Regions:
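An N-terminal assembly and electron-transfer interface module characteristic of large anaerobic redox
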Residues: 1-319
């Protein structure tokens, strides 16, 4: 069973006792439950299972309650948070201060105690502290006893939730660069600061010759290769298309067959480089079996490779 990051729901409230907080408890928790239901029923993880939500044990009106909520979320494996409120709250005491969790704040557009002021104040606090948050506010005014989520608000919540889950799943994993700068394209220069500071990822790099080494030394699962080659013979080689090269530049049938074998092996090897492969350990290749913990990778397609050997188009399409 995969362990995916959950979304934490933070119901914040005006912490003043004596009638203020008490009058808002039920409303605020109802909004939190509605958000959790919305996300779990519409957003899924990559394997198709619903995204799990964790709601704070109670409303958050003071910093001690913020801390208790953060502790619970750490235990539960939360990877992103959305703060929900129907009223003014004390922003610096109730805001999510975790620097690694993607954040959103929904301020309820209500008739009596609108969340607009808190939304503006807490978003300013997030910006000042360098902890970006996505602000959500409804177009239409709702009655205080209306706990429904308007369509425009729901769309914003779901857009944020999908992005937040993706970012949370990337954190702690690697981007694997196979090769160096691609074809002189500045956009292919890997910005390690972006990956580390914005996505919480690390960067790994191997030379393109590692693919050739693994081919030459047979560092791939032969049984898996046979299955992959049979699939390719059936579904890909039969759709090669027309040969548009000049006759003197055209490859022979034997050369084309060799290219197909090459790109299939290349695909398996790139996958092994990214995620590792326990089968390689059984074959005696303990280091290669580990992989680079990569959730994404790029074959940089340097001319020194692509003018000489098959490029990575097939690998990229399959992966």
């Amino acid at each position: 069973m995969n362990k995916y990051p959950k979304i934490g729901i933070r119901p914040t409230i005006d912490g003043r006792q004596g009638g203020v907080r008490e009058s808002l408890e039920d409303k605020t928790m109802s909004l939190a439950r509605a958000v959790a239901d919305l996300i779990s029923s519409h957003v899924k993880y990559s394997d198709g299972t619903p995204v799990e939500c964790v709601i704070a044990d109670g409303t958050i009106g003071r910093v001690g309650e913020s801390a208790a909520c953060a502790e619970k979320f750490e235990r539960e494996g939360v990877g992103a948070t959305i703060t929900v409120t129907s009223c003014w709250c004390y922003g610096s005491e109730t805001m999510d201060m975790n620097p690694y969790w993607p954040k959103a704040v929904w301020g309820f557009n209500g008739t009596e105690r609108p969340g607009a002021v808190y939304l503006a104040a807490v978003l300013a606090g997030h910006a000042q502290k360098g902890l970006p948050a996505f602000g959500i506010y409804g177009r239409d005014v709702q009655d205080l006893d209306d706990n429904s989520i308007p369509a425009d608000v729901a769309e914003k919540i779901l857009r944020w939730a999908r992005a937040a889950v993706a970012v949370a799943q990337m954190r702690g994993q690697s981007y694997l660069s196979i090769g160096s700068q691609c074809m002189g394209i500045a956009g292919s220069i890997v910005d390690q600061n972006f990956f580390q500071e914005y996505l919480g990822m690390r960067n790994e790099s191997v030379d393109e010759t590692e693919i050739l080494r693994r081919m030459e030394e047979g560092i791939y699962d032969r049984e898996e290769y046979a299955k992959a080659m049979a699939w390719t013979e059936k579904y890909c080689k039969t759709k090669e298309g027309w040969e548009k090269n000049r006759p003197e530049r055209q490859k022979t049938r034997e050369q084309k067959d060799a290219d197909w074998e090459f790109v299939v092996k290349m695909t398996l090897i790139v996958r092994d480089l990214m995620k590792g492969n326990p089968r390689l350990r059984e074959m005696g290749f303990k280091e290669e079996a580990i992989g680079h913990n990569a959730i994404a990778a790029g074959f940089q397609g340097q001319r020194q490779w692509t003018d000489w050997l098959p490029n990575a188009d097939f690998t990229e399409a399959i992966m």
